[in-house]
Amino acid sequence: MNIIAQLEAEQCAKIEAKRQLPKFQAGDTVRVMVRVTEGTRTRVQAYEGVCIARSGGGLNETFTVRKISYGEGVERVFPVYSPLIEGVELVRRGKVRRAKLYYLRGLRGKAARIAEKRVYRKKDEKVAERVQATAVTVDVAEQAAE
């Protein structure tokens, strides 16, 4: 590993220690908390929209968020490791088959909607959750008996 890549990895780790971002990709609706300075006041502003692209790598990684504001499409590019980003909330996952959703720029209204991705559980997971829930109930019952 060369020196520059090593320094970038250290900086990424340092920033990730302060705040954790959820794993999201193109098609997901996200709410980005951005620190905005107006004169002497500083406040946190939420910017909610569809992530249409992720690009770059390391410290230079960015993601583009598109939202419709007063009937106009507005896109904003955020660096992942920017100190101005307080956090990112994942609002919903989208079902798309592309990594870059630039085609949404030409669509309006219902045509620009993205279907929500459904997460299906396997039978084993439900059984494991039930077993864990019963174990907790039994523990509580034992503590109450004592």
From Swiss-Prot:
InterPro entries: Ribosomal_bL19, Ribosomal_bL19_CS, Ribosomal_bL19_sf, Translation_prot_SH3-like_sf
Keyword field: Ribonucleoprotein, Ribosomal protein
GO molecular-function term, one example from the UniProt record: structural constituent of ribosome
Its biological purpose: This protein is located at the 30S-50S ribosomal subunit interface and may play a role in the structure and function of the aminoacyl-tRNA binding site.
Organism: Bartonella quintana (strain Toulouse) (Rochalimaea quintana)
UniProt name for this protein: Large ribosomal subunit protein bL19
Family the entry assigns: Belongs to the bacterial ribosomal protein bL19 family.
Gene Ontology BP term (one): translation
Domain of life: Bacteria
Cellular-component GO terms for this entry: cytosolic large ribosomal subunit
